[in-house]
Amino acid sequence: MALKIRLARGGSKKRPYYQIVVADARSPRDGRFLEKLGSWNPMLAKDDEKRIELNAERVQHWIAQGAQPTDRVMRFLDQAGLAKRPARNNPTKAQPGKKAQERAAEAKQKAEEAAAAASEAAAE
């Protein structure tokens, strides 16, 4: 049985509240779980101590049993010092293509030349 430490959504519409639970990976998001490990209330201020509550001892127990935390829960565990979050791969997909980069460099160069010409004209 593959175990996950994940968030189960509660609360009402537009007022989210999450329980941090250990559940079988195949069970529904808000379905049956084995144990509640804590809670996360995203409506509270980021510096509020009750925003994220974790039972550190039980979290360590379930990780030792092989439970895999999800990305968001891993962030919480990293903040609490219970686990180390690995560095993420940051692909360069968001960069423009070669032609667009060349055009941007040319435009920047023209702007610099125009600024230099304007400063020379103002100096005379």
From Swiss-Prot:
The family database entries (SUPFAM superfamilies) matched by this protein are listed as: Ribosomal protein S16 (SSF54565)
Q: What sections of the protein cross the membrane?
A: none
Q: Where is this region: Disordered?
A: 80-124
One GO MF term, please? structural constituent of ribosome
Q: Which InterPro entries match?
A: Ribosomal_bS16 (IPR000307), Ribosomal_bS16_dom_sf (IPR023803)
The entry's keywords: Ribonucleoprotein, Ribosomal protein
| Stated family | Belongs to the bacterial ribosomal protein bS16 family.
Identification of the protein by name? Small ribosomal subunit protein bS16
Q: What is the lineage of its organism?
A: Bacteria, Pseudomonadati, Pseudomonadota, Alphaproteobacteria, Hyphomicrobiales
Gene encoding this polypeptide? rpsP
